[in-house]
Amino acid sequence: MIKVLFVCHGNICRSTMAQYVMQDLVTRHGLAEHFYINSAATSMEEIGNPVHRGTRAKLKEVGIPCGDHRAVQMQRSDYDKYDYIIGMDSWNCRNMMRILGKDPEGKVSLLLDYTDHPRDIADPWYTGNFDATYDDVKAGCEALLTHIQETEGRK
């Protein structure tokens, strides 16, 4: 079982979008039984809140259900629970390391680091552009899945 945790600031926009996009990808590839995919926040600001309406609307538009997710905060213990801990931007990664303390196994990375265009994914909470965020998240999740298939296939 490959365990992936997507992380952003509040766990209501980007990380949740990545969680559901990745779940859709592995399901469509017939790999769902090999993956456990979740998401979390670095902050406590949105804990308990549902998926942002903009994220929910974009996922619905592309035919991806997003369930009844509620925001949770990342914990230090998550390091031992997940194989991949994926941040949406550099600020998230700094805060993830503050929570985790260290990354001896190299589990922490940015989602778009798996693409040919590594960079931060803009937060639609501020930009209002859920289309651009979805495009980045989709590209990142597709590249991450390819990376996992190539890496895990060699083990």
Model-flagged regions — what are they?
Residues 1-81, 146-155:
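Conserved active-site segments centered on acidic
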Residues 78, 84, 90-155:
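Phosphate-binding/catalytic loops
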Residues 8, 59, 86-87, 137:
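Hydrophobic structural packing positions in well-ordered secondary structure
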